[in-house]
Design a protein with these regions (language model features):
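N-terminal localization/anchoring segments of enzymes in phospholipid and broader phosphate metabolism
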Residues: 1-536, 554, 558, 570-592, ...
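Hydrophobic alpha/beta core scaffold segments
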Residues: 561-565
């Protein structure tokens, strides 16, 4: 059923995502100070894109060209690395042109609010005297000019630092040289002056550019400009893994040093840059002219963070989002006790991470707790979570911390924390040679009179107090013994570098994540073919996995209504007639960064819902250790379903994909209420901390294909929960004439079953006859397959390849 017309290139899709971020920099519904923050986010996103994605593509293109090898083509749009690079550059140039326009407009509006940027081309005599004196006393003494000529080599240009470039006239006729002044990132970038009742701000690089003649001499300068280099940062960790006797931290530290000197991938210059200066820089940096971007806005927009901090300090609340803080539980709330009654789901940033931190601290001091185990991917600079682990170790408990040192751009922070954890007495492990451990898993083990009890936490987001207030994520906490035992196995396998399929209720990539989700999709497809109103709602950050995309196409053609909420990369086109016409995709980009992953499957009778740390990117499904879990508590199933429905009704932050792959902003129809899927969460989760009735899964029984009507009604009602103030149960309207009526029930009525189904499948007796599958979640488990990590480089990948089912 493969059809190339449904695919979108990964890199071009990412640029479309950054376009959606950039669009918030001009959105009138976004307060002005928040608009300029989005411009800064757009810029930092683009920096990272060039450092990682473009850097990787460039290396691949160079390798294929140098070795005259057959070019490797991307498996969806069939593009080579060189073709992808050729498509990226003009699209980036258009984005930058838009950014320049939005920036100019933002400056006008900031000036109208009393914050004016200094224009060094139009200084009054008084201002000229002030800034010249400031330059001479504060900046001139710390500048380090360099001349590039036959006696002075071209200096190394640091990644993402701004430089002043000056074309100089030599004494000999027609001779020229290049002068370079680093504008160190250690310098104070913004300088503020109060004048005429307003705050003026100046960028240090523009100040140095204006007074360049004070350094080189006015008669010598032919041309001057500012420029900035972006370097490849896609380090290959495997290169340093040949010697297993070397400490892994030392390897990563050395690789980080090496990364600073990788090849240049982009050159940004200001409009004053003469062609000769651009040519000289490209020659020295070995860059194509197609990698030069001339921009009218500052080369680094991160100064907006400091500017908005100044605005906030001077009390201009109207320029910012209204204050919104994570909701705290009642003063007597104890998560350790609450989770003994029923499963708990925390939703960040709407609910505070504080109860989870308090639970860790309590465990660290509880004499009956014997161990705490946790996977750590990105941690805060000042982490109370890590401090709790260290306290537990100092109190004599076994603490195992799996620290992923390869968390990109957080490597040094993780190296530093791993040393502190080790010094505190924790057992620190680093996971696999070939796989990043991206899972968010915590296990607290407690000794009891009759054995052991567990508290397990499985999340979609990092253990990071800072980002828990900025990213939307979900944290599932349970005292379920079966899940605790499986989590214990996961940690045991991680400690000895093994992968296993031995899990019933947890999803653990790479061996048992994608396969389970594909099986769930097959069940829904079979239900649709039987005429049931089957549907799926899939929320994550990105999708690129070809197997999953093709399965979504199959589901759409079978009449399954599919709603996807995909914030970022999306390599599948929605609503393509005859192919994905029942697939509807929207992206939410707003105040908070959407980061949670929820996968909901409705077979026309029952809803089965999962949360997980992994997206639908191929790297998540096949190349990382991810952890997910099916949520079975009826109250939590309803809560997650309500969250999904709220986001499907969002007409503030949402943009919907069209059949050509473009996105259109969703606007409320006439008379339709405004629904903000993010801010509506505060109402949805209000008074959500406790409930009267406990819930525990019952012992699993062989269930009939259809439960009696009265029994289903009782199960569907479940424990009582507060009805959210925001109406979240209204189904989205059908979209156009191609809409298939059989799939029109999304969001379908939810049937909540308190019965435990540990094998991952239930109520599918009729459906299984229609599925050409050798192994379904509710059938007897296959024999355990264990893959042992390699002793030599490369063997791990070879062995794992024997067990991968789909390519």
């Amino acid at each position: 059923m493969s059809d190339e017309t449904i695919f979108i290139n990964r890199e071009l899709s990412w640029l479309d995502f950054n376009r959606r971020v950039l669009a918030l920099g001009k959105d009138k519904n976004v307060p002005l100070a928040e608009q300029v923050k989005f411009l800064a986010i757009y810029g930092s996103n683009l920096d990272e894109f060039f450092m990682v994605r473009v850097g990787s593509l460039q290396e691949r293109a160079n390798l294929e060209q140098s070795k005259s090898k057959k070019e490797k083509r991307e498996n969806k749009t069939n593009m080579t690395a060189a073709e992808q690079l050729a498509a990226i550059m003009p699209k980036t140039a258009q984005l930058q042109a838009d950014c320049d326009k939005y920036y100019a407009k933002a400056l006008e509006e900031l000036a109208g609010c009393g914050y004016r940027k200094v224009d060094f081309d139009h200084l009054s005599k008084e201002d000229e005297r002030f800034w010249k004196k400031y330059f001479q006393t504060e900046l001139f003494p710390i500048l380090s000019p360099q001349i590039v000529d036959s006696r002075h080599p071209f200096p190394f240009l640091r990644n993402k630092e701004i430089y002043l470039g000056v074309l100089l006239r030599e004494k000999h006729p027609n001779a020229q040289s290049l002068g370079i002044i680093p504008i160190s990132s250690q310098m104070e970038r913004l300088h503020f002056v109060k004048k005429d009742g307003e705050t003026q701000f100046a960028l240090v690089e523009e100040l140095v550019l204006h007074y360049a003649s004070s350094i080189f001499g006015k008669e010598s300068i032919l041309e001057s400009c500012l420029f900035r280099v972006t370097r490849n940062a896609d380090i290959d960790v495997k290169e340093g893994m040949m010697d297993h006797d070397i400490d892994y931290r030392e390897i990563m530290t050395e690789l980080l040093k090496r990364r600073r000197k990788l090849a240049a991938v982009r050159l940004q210059v200001t409009p004053e840059a003469a062609p000769e200066v651009q040519r000289l820089l490209c020659s020295r940096l070995e860059l194509s002219g197609k990698r030069v971007f001339v921009q009218k806005s500052p080369l680094d927009l991160s100064f907006f963070y400091k500017l908005t901090g100044r605005i906030e300090a001077e009390d201009h609340p109207g320029l910012f989002y209204p204050a919104a803080r994570p909701m705290l539980p009642p003063p007597d709330y104890d998560l350790t006790e609450e989770v003994q009654k029923h499963d708990v789901l925390l939703s960040y940033p709407y609910q505070s991470i504080r109860p989870f931190i308090d639970m860790l601290k309590k465990a660290a001091r509880d004499p009956d707790v014997i161990s705490i185990k946790m996977t750590l991917y990105r941690m805060a600079r000042e982490s109370q979570i890590v401090q709790a682990l260290m306290e537990a170790a100092e109190n004599g408990k076994e603490v195992v911390a799996l620290v992923e040192l390869r968390a990109r751009f957080d490597e040094q922070n993780n190296i530093d924390w791993s040393k502190q954890l080790e010094n505190a007495g924790c057992t620190v492990i680093y996971g696999f040679d070939d796989y990043k451990v991206h899972s968010k898993l915590t296990l607290i083990t407690r000794k009891q009179a009759d054995g052991y009890s567990y508290i397990t936490q499985i999340g979609t987001g990092n253990y990071n107090e800072k980002t828990s207030e900025l990213y939307t994520d979900y944290s599932f906490i349970t005292a379920d013994e079966g899940i605790g035992e499986e989590a214990s196995k996961v940690f045991r396998n991680l400690a000895v570098q093994q992968l296993t399929e031995e899990s019933d209720r947890m999803l653990v990539a790479p061996l048992r994540f994608k396969s389970v989700l594909l099986d769930e999709m097959d069940h829904v497809i079979a239900a649709a073919r039987m005429g049931r109103p089957a549907s799926m709602i899939l929320k994550n950050n990105s999708i690129s996995d070809r197997d999953i995309i093709l399965k979504l196409q199959e589901a759409s053609c079978a009449g399954v209504r599919i709603d996807m909420i995909v914030r970022g990369i999306c390599c599948v086109r929605a609503e393509v007639p005859g192919k994905t016409e029942n697939l509807h995709i929207r992206s939410l980009v707003g105040r908070y960064l959407e980061h949670g992953r929820i996968y909901s499957f409705f077979d026309g009778v029952h809803t089965r819902i999962y949360i997980a740390s992994g997206d639908f990117l191929t790297r998540n499904t096949e190349c990382r250790v991810e952890v997910g879990v099916r949520v079975e508590d009826p109250v939590l199933v309803k809560k997650l379903t309500d969250i999904l429905q709220l986001q499907l009704r969002d007409n503030v932050n949402a943009r919907e994909m069209c059949a050509d792959g473009s996105y259109q902003k969703v606007k409320p129809a006439e008379g339709e209420p405004i629904v903000n899927g993010q801010m509506g969460m505060y109402d949805l989760l209000r008074n959500d901390w406790t409930r009267e009735e406990p819930w525990k899964p019952t012992t699993p029984k062989a269930a009939p294909a259809e439960a009696p009507a009265a029994e289903k009604q009782t199960a569907a009602e479940g424990p009582k929960a507060k009805t959210p103030e925001v109406p979240v149960q209204e189904p989205p309207k059908a979209k156009g004439p191609d809409f298939v009526e059989a799939a029109s029930a999304t969001p379908a009525p939810i049937h909540l079953e308190p019965t435990e189904h540990p094998k991952g499948g239930d109520h599918f007796d009729e459906l299984e006859q229609m599925l050409d599958k050798k192994h379904l979640p509710d059938q007897p488990q296959k024999p355990t397959v264990v893959v042992t990590a390699p002793k030599k480089r490369g063997l791990f990948s070879q062995v794992l390849g024997l067990f991968k089912k789909r390519k």
